[in-house]
Curated annotation (Swiss-Prot):
Major subcellular site: virion
Anything else known: All late proteins expressed from the major late promoter are produced by alternative splicing and alternative polyadenylation of the same gene giving rise to non-overlapping ORFs. A leader sequence is present in the N-terminus of all these mRNAs and is recognized by the viral shutoff protein to provide expression although conventional translation via ribosome scanning from the cap has been shut off in the host cell.
Keyword set, alphabetical order: Capsid protein, Host nucleus, Host-virus interaction, Late protein, Viral attachment to host adhesion receptor, Viral attachment to host cell, Virion, Virus entry into host cell
Subcellular location: Virion; Host nucleus
The protein, known as: Fiber protein
UniProt family annotation: Belongs to the adenoviridae fiber family.
Domain remark from Swiss-Prot or TrEMBL: The tail region anchors the fiber to penton base capsomers, whereas the shaft, built from several repeated motifs, allows the knob to protrude from the virion.
Phylogenetic placement of the source organism: Viruses, Varidnaviria, Bamfordvirae, Preplasmiviricota, Tectiliviricetes
A GO cellular-component term linked to this record: viral capsid
Segment forming the signal sequence: none
Cited function: Forms spikes that protrude from each vertex of the icosahedral capsid. Interacts with host receptor to provide virion initial attachment to target cell. Fiber proteins are shed during virus entry, when virus is still at the cell surface.
Amino acid sequence: MKRTRSALPANFDPVYPYDAPKPSTQPPFFNDRKGLTESSPGTLAVNISPPLTFSNLGAIKLSTGAGLILKEGKLEANIGPGLTTNQEGQITVEKDSDGLTFTSPLHKIENTVSLSIGEGLEDESGTLKVNFPSPPPPLLFSPPLAEAGGTVSLPLQESMQVTEGKLGVKPTTYSPPLQKTDQQVSLRVGPGLTVLNGQLQAVQPPATTYKEPLLETENSVSLKVGAGLAVQDGALVATPPNVTFSAPLEKNGNAVSVRVGAGLSIQGNALVATTSPTLTFAYPLIKNNNHITLSAGSGLRVSGGSLTVATGPGLSHINGTIAAVIGAGLKFENNAILAKLGNGLTIRDGAIEAVAPQPSFTPVTLWTGPDPNVNTSINGTPVIRSFISLTRDSNLVTVNASFTGEGSYQSVSPTQSQFSLILEFNQFGQLMSTGNLNSTTTWGEKPWGNNTVQVQPSHTWKLCMPNREVYSTPAATLTSCGLNSIAHDGAPNRSIDCMLIINKLAGAATYTLTFRFLNFNKLSSSTVFKTDVLTFTYVGENQ
């Protein structure tokens, strides 16, 4: 006989036998609008914007401009001599400061600043005032002098002029191209003109040549223009290129604007960073001073600034996923690692076993014969006619049975006590003499060609017995059992219950089948004890 193996759970995994699967930790597992981002992909980083930046050590720091300074981890105003801050944090001038100097007419004496004043000025109740002198007597003017609105003027004829405050005769003036040299008047001529024999004449110009971008065509000169230039209404103009704008830039008419998101705004035509809300960090993120770290538990680790899954022997990272490294004799099937089995091998109870070639199987039936006598005893008295057949086909055994009472068990009432009919078999599947249906009655194998009973034992009888590994402890099946159903035409209150108990061992028996009849109180009155055909199945024993 084979050694009985301890049963394993149906979901037992021999390759990865852990109590519970670990949760997946593949990124992303964060909200990229809540202070975190991926930089580069698959790497967790803090999402910051100016004035926040990173130091050379990777810590978050604050960039400061003119007038600001970081002191002992706090942002303060950078103030110079003569200035200080009061208890309210306001910038004020120092009382005993030498930062202010005074020059005449201002003078500082202790805590008082005074103003020196001269003639024509006076201090009237703290107000500086000008003292005007008494006006002189009015003046009288005679021609050619004239007075108008407080101004004295001298009328001049066309030949007179005032030069540097002096009255003189206005000289004769000549406008270009006439010019006066000493006492002579001459005519200035430019290119293309000359004076010959006292006469103004035109000078014939030399032949004109044109270089690019000028182009002469017949009697006209034109200008060749390239990309970005054009001639419109006789004028050279620049044509704007076809410029496209990508986000965050956008064009509206002739104006180009920039779109801003959270943390940015436009103030005074300048892009500035708005104050970001205070960052809070939830587990597994931990903030320590100015550093943010990620708490990694079992199965995780931080490597090269990235969160990765810690793998042990037999596991590796392939294309960003965890894969098992398998060798010869193993394979992947339905997301599980299985052993590759050749001919003659199988897996039983999680272990690889060698199996013998399966012979061709012929169904086996053990029975009482088609019309047995009163073959079952209760308390030593034959009182039940039992028809029982056990048929092994493939791995299952089908039980067909019916029972008819005789004598004191010909009829039963609602007060009938429950009773059992037991069949006991030895290790070879042979019926023993210790049960209610025993070896003294007709019992054996049914041939294929007739309805006789072959009582000569065979090694195949064991195949009809219950499998001892499957039914290592007693197992039961309860079914309703109708009594004399044909005569009563299936009337209600004419059924009891029958329980088949498998391998409830007692004494020297190796296998047992127990038919237990109970719940007679379901009957409405006395009834003939003639059961319907009962059918059960169980797993058969190995050869």
